[in-house]
Amino acid sequence: SLYAPSALVLTIGQGDSASAGIQRAVTLSCMPTPSGTHPDARDACAQLRQADGKFDELTATKAGTYCTKEWNPVTVTATGVWEGQRVNYSHTFGNPCMAKAAKSTVFSF
């Protein structure tokens, strides 16, 4: 194959762990072309490539974002393969506002 495989299942759940009640899930494949059930696969793949697959960069909060301090956790996960490497990523945001304030749209679905 000319391309290293990149196929992920992305989830968003309510709660503070990866086993939280999953509310939404999509698939994202980036090679050879962006595809899957992600609503903006092309942009999500471009952001993943730009971050070199470092999901922590994608879940960082945009500068100048203001959210309440309420604890209403939202957990996002990415499981699968990115450029041939196994991925098992999980990140918990303090609340939905913080999740929406992430720098990327990879987990916007």
UniProtKB/Swiss-Prot annotation:
Whether Disulfide bond counts among this entry's keywords is yes
Xref: InterPro entries: Prot_inh_I16_SSI, Prot_inh_SSI_I16_CS, Subtilisin_inhibitor, Subtilisin_inhibitor-like_sf
UniProt subcellular location = Secreted
Which cysteines form disulfides?
Answer: C30-C45, C67-C97
Record keywords, A-Z? Disulfide bond, Protease inhibitor, Secreted, Serine protease inhibitor
Molecular functions (GO terms): serine-type endopeptidase inhibitor activity
Provide GO CC annotations from the record: extracellular region
Q: Which domain of life is it from?
A: Bacteria
Q: Where is this site: Reactive bond?
A: K69, E70
Listed SUPFAM superfamilies: Subtilisin inhibitor
Q: How does it assemble?
A: Homodimer.
Give the family this protein belongs to, as stated in its UniProt record.
Belongs to the protease inhibitor I16 (SSI) family.
Name recorded for this polypeptide: Protease inhibitor SIL-V2
Give the originating organism: Streptomyces orinoci (Streptoverticillium orinoci)
